[in-house]
Regions:
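Class I (Rossmann-like) S-adenosyl-L-methionine-dependent methyltransferase catalytic domain
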Residues: 1-28, 36-85, 102-109, 123-243
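Short acidic/histidine-rich motifs immediately flanking catalytic phosphotransfer sites
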Residues: 89
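Short catalytic micro-motifs in class I SAM-dependent methyltransferases
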Residues: 97-101
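A short glycine-rich, Lys/Arg-flanked "PGG" loop and its adjoining helix->strand segment in the class I
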Residues: 108-120
Length: 243
């Protein structure tokens, strides 16, 4: 898929949580745990007073530091998101897809550690890939745990966080649908090149042009027929720890 697809996804994601970000206020201090290449650090630095990103991968840290080098209120350093957290306090802590790599006990422990680093009235926002029911644990080369919204609620409750507000991530869903169509094209039109920027761009352009059907109506119809498609979902969760 073309870079425009990633830009579209990210723009839709920001739109999804925009009201939550507005509630924090421009003077807010932000911690991004597992910040990757710094896309969200850059977004937050353009909205808030100060942003700190922590990332384990040295390659990702270098990419993130380069990305936010022009922003004096943003800082990224290398560290383990579970062991090398700054003390804070922070008005807003963001985790963009870290929990799915942790077991349940580690999720609860990390949430408790993050909760202790919030300012009064501060919030935690998670962005996690999800399944519709229960848990799907993948083993092998790529080990990950996909949890349902209800399972995340239960883990938050174990960490002492009872106010949990989920929001579906339509930007992620659009990308997942596009990737499914690419897989279908490769399977049924195998005579075409599997890796083709032109074909990827054409696929994305057609899906975007038919967005009311491809990104909304089709998944709704299939879900009503009890056909879970796309298989994975993604949700944002706003967590408000009680005082």
């Amino acid at each position: 898929l073309p870079s425009k697809a990633v830009e579209y996804r990210l723009a839709r994601e920001v739109e999804t949580i925009s009201s939550w970000l507005d509630d924090i206020g421009e003077s807010g201090s932000v911690l991004d745990v597992g910040c990757g290449a710094g896309a969200w650090v850059e977004i937050f630095a353009n909205r808030f007073q100060s942003v700190v990103g922590v990332e384990r991968s040295p390659q990702m840290v270098a990419a993130a530091q380069e990305r936010v080098a022009h922003l004096p209120n943003a800082r990224v350093y290398q560290g383990d998101g579970r062991q090398d957290l700054p003390e804070g306090p922070f008005d807003f802590i963001f985790l963009g897809g870290l929990m799915m790599y942790l077991g349940d006990a580690d999720v609860v422990e990390l949430l408790q550690a993050l909760k202790s680093r919030l300012s009064e009235g501060g919030v935690i926002i998670l962005r996690e890939s999800t399944v519709r029911k229960g848990v799907l644990a993948l083993k092998g080369e790529y080990q990950v745990i996909y949890r349902s919204v209800n399972v995340y609620r239960q883990l938050c409750e174990q960490a002492g966080i009872t106010e949990v507000e989920p929001r579906g991530n339509s930007g992620y869903a659009s990308m997942a649908i596009a990737e499914e169509f690419v897989r279908i094209r490769r399977k049924w039109l195998s005579f075409l090149p599997k890796e083709s920027l032109l074909l990827g761009s054409l696929t994305w352009a057609v899906l975007r042009a038919a967005a009311p059907v491809s990104f909304w109506a089709l998944p709704q119809i299939l879900n009503r027929l009890h056909i879970p498609w796309p298989k994975l979902q993604n949700h944002f969760f706003r967590l408000r720890p009680s005082s």
